[in-house]
């Protein structure tokens, strides 16, 4: 049976986990042949929940921020996190403690190696393990400006291959997505843009 997530499988600023259960209640009022269009898709959580609750419905997820690409790289991200975890544990750095000196330098050297040889780093996930309070950075130079902490999780992220199963994924400006489906019968727009208080630095 397909697993239903009530929070996004990878870190994301402004994910909708706080009202996931209330959202499920609201979905019950819509028929099974509804076309749901998630205009500001973010982590895809609302699209995922909608498809789990309404498996026969059409669900369109506007992945403007490239979350699907992050999901596809989970195995690579887990491998990098495992290396970082081993480095921190070998040095005996306690949880939530600051990472300084030679270990900090070695961590950045490992990140630079990954970027050079692997060609991809999920900076949001990696920085969530090395920084505090959702202080996500999107490049190594930006990370170097910040203090590092041992906030690395002890286990791998689940690969969640079925998270977006059965969902139509697009990546467009929300106005374009709205115009594309506005004349379709039984369409319902899921409209939840980033809050004014949300740090939009990680959004496209």
Regions inferred by a protein language model and the residue ranges of each:
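Conserved S-adenosyl-L-methionine
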Residues: 52-58
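A general structural motif
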Residues: 31-34, 56, 184-186
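Short, well-ordered alpha-helical scaffold segments within catalytic/effector domains
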Residues: 16-24, 154, 171, 175
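Conserved proline-anchored active-site loop of SAM-dependent methyltransferases
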Residues: 37-50, 61-65, 129-131, 183-199
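Conserved mid-sequence domains
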Residues: 164-204
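S-adenosyl-L-methionine
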Residues: 1-35, 45, 125, 129
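Short, well-ordered alpha-helical microsegments
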Residues: 20, 43-47, 177-179
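Class I S-adenosyl-L-methionine-dependent methyltransferase module
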Residues: 58-164
């Amino acid at each position: 049976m397909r697993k239903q997530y009530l929070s996004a499988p990878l870190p994301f600023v402004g994910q909708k986990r706080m009202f996931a259960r209330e959202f499920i209640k609201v979905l019950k009022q819509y028929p099974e042949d509804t076309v749901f269009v998630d205009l500001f898709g973010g982590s895809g959580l609302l699209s995922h929940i909608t498809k789990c609750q309404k498996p026969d419905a059409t669900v369109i997820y506007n992945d403007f921020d490239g979350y699907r690409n992050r999901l596809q790289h989970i195995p690579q991200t887990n491998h990098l996190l495992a290396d970082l975890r081993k480095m921190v544990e070998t040095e005996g750095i306690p949880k939530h403690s600051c990472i300084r000196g030679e270990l900090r330098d070695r961590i950045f050297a490992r990140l630079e190696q990954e970027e050079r040889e692997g060609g991809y780093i999920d900076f949001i996930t990696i920085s969530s393990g090395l920084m505090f309070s959702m202080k996500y950075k999107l490049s190594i130079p930006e990370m170097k400006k910040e203090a590092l902490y041992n906030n690395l999780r002890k286990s791998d992220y689940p690969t969640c291959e079925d998270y977006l199963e059965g969902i139509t994924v697009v990546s467009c400006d929300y106005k374009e997505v709205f115009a594309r489906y506005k004349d379709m019968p039984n369409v319902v727009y899921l409209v939840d843009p980033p809050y004014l208080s949300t740090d939009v630095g990680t959004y496209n």
